[in-house]
Amino acid sequence: MPEPGGHPVVWDACAQIVAARLMPSFHTRRVVCHPPKAMFDLVADVERYPEFVPLCEALEIRSRTPESDGAEVITATMTAGYGLIRESFTSRVRLDHAAARILVSYVDGPFRTLENHWSFLPHPRGCEVDFFIQYEFRSRTLQMLVGALFDGAVRRFSDAFEIRADRVYGRPTAKVNIGTPLRCTSPGDMKLPRR
């Protein structure tokens, strides 16, 4: 017969499920008219984030480490700010070129949890970009002060990267007919700028 109050493992699992549902998160999947490698490289270029990522004021690379499977791990500290509020946090960014995935895990800062991932899949019109982020601030006060602002910025992330891609790689030529979706002429025709 179970103890009154239930089994601790079951309660822990229930608490994790409830916390996951209450934790702010955002997921989007969209097709962009740029090749997967171009989009991967754009998101992987974390040093440029202060130029276009919402709320990102500064970013400092702490380390770069190649892994045996060909992936690269970057540890970076980002300073995010709005008005008089500034917070810095450190993340571990795993760039998996072979799988066309970028995984970001939280190391230190004002969050209890912060994780996100990107994946870049070939698509007839360019690339299908999948972006997911989940976060929770440690401080309820900070959550109340900047939670809605941060949530709004997170929802603009994928837009910011798509706009940046158009600026860096050029806006792809598209055929638009009334009543039909936007179509790139051909992902193979898109040229990447020389570095």
What residue spans do the PLM features occupy?
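Hydrophobic ligand-binding cavity/cleft-lining segments
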Residues: 10-71, 125, 171, 182-195
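Short alpha-helical basic/polar micro-motif
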Residues: 37, 118, 159
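Short, well-structured hydrophobic secondary-structure segments
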Residues: 74-78
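Generic recognition of short, well-ordered alpha-helical segments
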Residues: 44, 115, 144-145
